[in-house]
């Protein structure tokens, strides 16, 4: 099993997932991730300081406001937001973080489509947080056709690997 697959398996084994970056303005990849986690039986928490609810579920301004500590955090927001959220993960003792990147785990290919921040990745690693720096849970959690194809293409192109 590849390192990424092992990390994904560990992340998806968690039960309570905070999803940072949901939006009420339009359908987004983050919204799709939230709904995919929820439909697969996870306890999910929407996080965005600009909105109060998402699809009838409460939306929280930050991780500290959640009713319980999440087991894992999925971030699909700007790298600047990712830096702040990872600081909260450190404070709360969250041990699993996934930073989204549309282009696999090589965000240099399309810096505008990534939540990956080198500072956030480093902060995770320094604090014993398992971090997946790129890709998308929708490629692994009962993927639809498009996400299955992205996973296959990024895998063939070497864009699904993780460096320690």
What spans do the regions from the language model cover?
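Glycine-rich, highly charged phosphate/nucleotide-binding loops
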Residues: 2-4, 54-86
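Mid-chain, well-packed structural core segment of small domains
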Residues: 71-114
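A short helix->loop->beta-strand "cap" motif at the edges of active sites that frequently abuts
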Residues: 41-42, 92-96, 127-129
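Conserved beta-strand elements of the Class I
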Residues: 18-20
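Conserved anion/nucleotide-ligand pocket segment
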Residues: 150-164
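Short N-terminal or domain-adjacent regulatory/targeting segments
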Residues: 1-13
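NAD(P)-binding Rossmann-fold cofactor-contacting core
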Residues: 23-28, 34-55
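Rossmann-fold NAD(P)-binding glycine/threonine-rich loop
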Residues: 102-138
